[in-house]
From Swiss-Prot:
This is Succinate--CoA ligase [ADP-forming] subunit beta. Mg(2+) binds at N199, D213. GO terms for molecular function: ATP binding; magnesium ion binding; succinate-CoA ligase (ADP-forming) activity; succinate-CoA ligase (GDP-forming) activity. Residues 9-244 form the ATP-grasp domain. Gene3D superfamilies: ATP-grasp fold, A domain (3.30.1490.20), ATP-grasp fold, B domain (3.30.470.20), Succinyl-CoA synthetase domains (3.40.50.261). The lineage of its organism: Bacteria, Pseudomonadati, Pseudomonadota, Betaproteobacteria, Burkholderiales. It comes from Janthinobacterium sp. (strain Marseille) (Minibacterium massiliensis).
């Protein structure tokens, strides 16, 4: 689950992390009132969407008068902001963050992720903060420093101080940087975050350490423990198909291809997409129906996939372990009839009651294309999507 920048900063402040003063706003008038309340002579008008690259996309503006605050708020609110993370369709901006301006002497980068290899939280930091951290990671990875945090000991003072020095924090600000990193780690750990990114973390003209931006992702499976974070969820920022899928305990992620995939098990689903790509196709989605798929769930899965106008064919790939192939076959047939399926359907199933499942499909009277293995299934669905 993702949240907005201003919400991430609310969390950080609870853990003692310094952020600029600011207010979320939903209208131009609110934006001007927020600037008046903040005082000062410089304000930053920031689009609030669940995507990075807002500055490059024109979603972050520095205003030096209240008239400019009004102008930029009017320009940004309601705009479709396109960044490298939104895709070409962009995101509609429905809320802003108005913040006090900052005296930036140096921009740094600090992030945390769960590192599966070390089975620890990895802290990553770089002296090259700001909008081009992706470029740094790709072209000069040696400028990114890492420490893998022991979950028992936490982030040690010595580890934080070492990282701070490596990224160029002034000696007089090392203590602040240490407190920031330890506060960020505590926030990350206690909120069940999967990613936290501060880009940029700045050193101000008077050598204060301030989190100028904040990005958080959380483990959706842990949100039952954090109702206060769950309340921050912005459904307007999420794919309607993914929201609908979650109502039926389906794990669905939209992609940009034209072959719908319905699979049981996340590993098999990823392998299925890989094989489709291997045979020259492009998956339109990741869809895991789980181990207890019912006819209703399969039907809803078909409905969700078919809302995508780009879909040219569907591949159902099932391994019958907990789930029996005959039950899936009946669900596929019922779903195909209920949604009035008009695109080619390829089904590959193996495992419990496999032969019975294939028999049910063969006797259904529906133009279902069957396959005996994944390679054959991928080849057939790619050909079907191409009209061959």
């Amino acid at each position: 689950m993702n949240i907005h920048e201003y919400q991430g900063k609310e969390i950080l402040r609870k853990y003692g992390v310094t952020t600029p003063k600011g207010f979320p706003c939903f209208s131009v008038d609110e934006a001007v009132q927020a600037a008046e309340k903040l005082g000062g002579k410089v304000w930053v008008v920031k689009a609030q969407i669940h995507a990075g690259g807002r500055g490059k996309g024109g979603g972050v503006k520095v205003a030096k008068s209240l008239d400019e605050v009004r102008k930029y708020a009017n320009d940004i609110l309601g705009m479709t902001l396109v960044t490298h993370q939104t895709g070409p369709e962009g995101r509609l901006v429905k809320r802003l963050l108005i913040e006090e301006g900052a005296d930036i002497k140096k921009e740094l980068y600090v992030g945390m992720v769960v590192d599966r290899g070390s089975q620890r939280v990895a802290l990553m930091a770089s002296s090259e903060g700001g909008m081009d951290i992706e470029h740094v990671a790709e072209h000069t990875p040696e400028k990114i420093h890492k420490v893998f945090i022991d979950p028992v000991k936490g982030l040690l003072d010595s580890e934080a101080d070492d990282i701070a020095r490596k990224i160029g924090v002034p000696e007089g600000s090392i203590g602040q940087a240490r407190a920031f990193m330890q506060g960020l780690y505590k926030a990350f750990d206690e909120t069940d975050a999967s990613l936290a990114e501060i880009n940029p973390l700045i050193v101000t003209g008077d050598d204060r350490i301030v989190a100028l931006d904040a990005k958080f992702n959380f483990d959706s499976n842990a949100m039952y423990r954090h109702p206060e974070i769950q309340e921050m969820r912005d459904l307007d920022e999420e794919d309607p198909a993914e929201i609908e899928a979650s109502k039926f305990d389906l794990t669905y992620i939209s992609l940009d291809g034209n072959i719908g995939c319905l699979v049981n098990g996340a590993g098999l689903a990823m392998a299925t997409m890989d094989v489709i790509k291997l045979y020259g196709g492009s998956p339109a989605n990741f869809l895991d129906v789980g181990g207890g798929a019912t006819t209703e769930k399969v039907t809803e899965a078909f409905k969700i996939m078919l809302k995508n106008p780009d879909i040219k064919a569907i591949l159902v790939n099932i391994f019958g372990g907990i789930m029996k192939c005959d039950v899936i076959a009946q669900g596929v047939i019922a779903a195909a009839k209920q949604v009035d399926l008009t695109v080619p359907l390829v089904v590959r199933m193996a495992g419990t009651n496999e032969e019975l499942g294939k028999k049910i499909l063969a006797e259904s009277g529906l133009p279902i294309i069957t396959a005996n293995n994944m390679a054959e299934a991928a080849e057939k669905v790619v050909n079907a999507a191409q009209g061959k």
